[in-house]
Every structure is written in C-alpha cells, then in structure tokens.
C-alpha cells in the first residue's frame, strides 16, 4: 500500500504561486470563518444527538428492533457521507462549488430538523440518511474551496486549521447536545437550523472560484487536459481509509479502555477524553508550522500514532493510558491535515472536487468501519487493549513502508513547502 503513494511530480499543481484571494482583512476573515463553520456541520451531525440516544431508546421502546435502530440515527449520516462523497465531488466539478455548497447547506437544515415533526423511527432514520447526503456535499465543497482559494503554505495552514476546528467542535457539540437534550430528546435537532444563518452569508461572501480559474487558465487552453491522477489518489485514499481508523480509535474506544481498568466515573472518563482531544488540536497546530512536504511527514506521523497505541496496549494504569492516548492523538492531529494536503497537491482545479470527494469518502468510510474492525480484533486476541496494540503494529508497518517508498523515490530530501507570498 505505501508504495502506491509517489511523491508529487515536478509539475505538481501545488506550485508556489500566490494565493488567488486575499489572505488578510475582513473579507478574508469572513470567508475563512464560513468555510470553517461549514466544515464543522458534518461533525455536528455525527455527535450532537449522542447524549440523547438513551432518551430516544426509551421513547421508541415499543418499536420492534429499536435497540438496534436507534443507534443508526447517530451513525447513518456518516455512512451516507462515505458512500456519496465521490458523487458529490463529480457534481462539484460540473456544477460549481459555491452553488452546490449553498443548496446543500439549506437542505442540511431541512433534513436535520425533520425529526422534530416525525413520529416514526424509520422516517427519522431516513431523514438522518438525507442529512448525510447534505453533509457529503458540504464537506466536499468546503475542502475543495480551501484548495481553490489558497495555495502553498497558506493552503497547508488552513487545511490544518480545518482539522483544528472540526476536532474542537466535536467536543463542543457533544456538550451542547447534552445540555439542550435536557429539554427532551427532540430538542437538539433544532440546532441543525443554524445552517440557515450560514447559507446566505456564504452566498454573499464566498467568491466563485470557477470564474477566476477560467480567466487565469485561459492562456493554457491549448495544452492538453491531463488525465485524472487515479493511481496516486488511490494510494492516498487507501492510506486515508486506514488513517481514519487510527484517528477514531481513541475517541471511540477510550471509555471502554478506561472501564477495563476499573474506571466508571463519567467525570474521569470525560476528562481523559478531553485531554486526548486537546492533543489532537495541538497536533494540527504543530503540522501547520512544519516546513517540509506532507509526504515526508507521513511516515513520522504514522510512527507517532503507532507508538501511542503501543503505550496504550502496555498501560496498566490510568495515567499511562492517558499518556499513550495523548501521544496517539498528537499524531492523529497531524495525520488528518497531512493526508488531505498530500491529496490536494496532486489535484488540478478541474479535478479538485472529484478528488476531494474520493478522499472524504475514504476518510468517513474508515471512520464507519473503525469500531467494527476493533471489535473483530478484540474477539481475535481476547481484549480491547490487544486490539489497539495490533492496530499500533499495523501503523508502524505503514510508517516503515512509507519511509522505504520515499527513499526509493529519491524523496528523502524534498523541496520545502513554498513560503506565503501574500
């Protein structure tokens, strides 16, 4: 798998040209705020209703299969997102990023608030699947627009900021969902309406990158259109699928690992998870300051993640488990923007929507199967800690393979990322 991820060619589209839009001033801040807010909407869909699932379970107790169906209300948007993001990417390239983003943001509010008026559990799950459709378009469009608006070091910086915002918002939305859920299990669904405030601002403040690209690239019309980079994107997407499992292991399994050590206090579990989440944010901030190619960073990042899993596997006490989780999450904080930046460096403007959709599908597909894979590993080795240790060993193998691939490709001493020119 690692050998299928070659370094960018000398003609990679991630050239040192200045960012095509202003990178300072009020317009820039508003544009960046909207893109970050849009990127957080799929996270909201993933965690907002988690605290009220027990209340939903009680409400639909008389519905056949409710014990299995109610959790689907939480997870089915991620599955829809993973399945449909590639199609969203194709639509992005054909219809335009901004137009699809605005439509999807409005539909997000419509589908997200639907459970306020639906009484059937099946209908609610159906509306949640449609939320995932809107999320696929929103995430693909926001990430693609970051790639369109910014280049070089600015692009790296803002993709890392996207990872920071989505990681921090997950914790915030979980707290908000729990607080609002005190008013009833339907109450958190009102929060989906916030996207109706964002959509008109996006329409007014986000420039249309298609028009800009058409004027800037007009002199190159005579040049033959290069084919879509299927082979390098396949390698990046395979890495991303595995990386998503690495990324989500601590958030999904930390409470169970603590329980295995005899910790049942929700406050202690919440504090330990919050500390690990803070390390994820710190890792993304560290990545934003790196001055080397993301391809060179990936072996070290996977090695850090694997080392953290190794400590967690060996941990016989809560403090050591938390240390391992912090090490792992420091690595995963760098992993997400490293993978995304590496993918972006291989995509021309006309391919960026499709490529971003494929990457998004790979990431959320890995997130969806993460607990299933760990469950299978746990059954095989007889314990969750052992399953985490196996995943850490796999991360170490991937790190070694990537390092070897870079050496074979002569990329051990790559060019540094371009400095900001605006």
Language-model segments: residues:
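Extracellular/periplasmic helix-loop-helix junction of adjacent transmembrane segments
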Residues: 52-83
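Helix-to-loop junctions at the C-terminal end of transmembrane segments
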Residues: 83-96, 282-295, 378
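Paired small-residue
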Residues: 107, 111-114, 122-131, 319-327
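Cytoplasmic helix-loop-helix junction between adjacent transmembrane helices
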Residues: 121, 127-167
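Helix-loop-helix hairpin linking two adjacent transmembrane segments in secondary transporters
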Residues: 152-154, 161-211
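A late C-terminal transmembrane helix in Major Facilitator Superfamily
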Residues: 344-382
């Amino acid at each position: 798998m690692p050998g299928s991820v070659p370094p960018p060619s000398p003609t990679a589209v991630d050239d040192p040209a200045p960012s095509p839009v202003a990178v300072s001033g009020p317009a820039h801040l508003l544009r960046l705020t909207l893109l970050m807010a849009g990127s957080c909407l799929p996270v909201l869909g993933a965690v907002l209703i988690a605290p009220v699932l027990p209340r939903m379970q009680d409400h639909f107790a008389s519905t056949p299969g409710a014990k299995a169906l109610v959790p689907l209300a939480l997870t089915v948007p991620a599955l829809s997102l993973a399945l449909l993001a590639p199609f969203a990417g194709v639509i992005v390239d054909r219809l335009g990023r901004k137009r699809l983003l605005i439509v999807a943001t409005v539909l997000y509010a419509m589908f997200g608030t639907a459970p306020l008026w639906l009484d059937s559990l099946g209908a609610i799950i159906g509306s949640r699947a449609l939320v995932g459709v809107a999320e696929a378009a929103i995430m693909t469009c926001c990430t693609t627009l970051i790639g369109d608006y910014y280049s070089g070091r600015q692009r790296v910086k803002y993709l890392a900021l996207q990872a920071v915002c989505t990681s921090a918002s997950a914790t915030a939305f979980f707290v908000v969902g729990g607080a609002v859920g005190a008013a009833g299990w339907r109450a958190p669904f009102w929060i989906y309406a916030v996207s109706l405030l964002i959509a008109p601002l996006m329409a007014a403040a986000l420039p249309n990158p298609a028009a800009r690209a058409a004027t800037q690239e007009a002199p190159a019309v005579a040049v033959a259109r290069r084919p879509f980079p299927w082979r390098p994107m396949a390698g990046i997407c395979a890495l991303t699928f595995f990386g998503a499992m690495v990324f989500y292991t601590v958030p999904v399994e930390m409470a169970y690992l603590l329980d295995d050590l005899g910790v049942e206090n929700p406050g202690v579990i919440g504090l330990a998870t919050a500390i690990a989440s803070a390390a994820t944010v710190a890792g993304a901030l560290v990545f934003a300051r790196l001055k080397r190619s993301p391809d060179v960073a990936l072996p070290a990042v996977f090695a850090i993640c694997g080392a953290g899993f190794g400590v967690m596997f060996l941990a016989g006490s809560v403090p050591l488990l938390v240390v391992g989780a912090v090490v792992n999450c420091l690595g995963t904080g760098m992993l997400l923007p490293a993978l995304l930046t590496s993918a972006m460096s291989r995509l021309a403007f006309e391919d960026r929507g499709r490529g971003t959709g494929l990457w998004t599908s790979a990431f959320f597909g890995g997130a969806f199967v993460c607990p299933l894979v760990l469950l299978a590993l746990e059954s095989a080795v007889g314990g969750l800690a052992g399953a985490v240790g196996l995943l850490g060993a796999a991360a170490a193998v991937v790190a070694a393979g990537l390092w070897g691939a870079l050496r074979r490709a002569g990329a051990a001493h790559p060019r540094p990322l371009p400095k900001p020119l605006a």
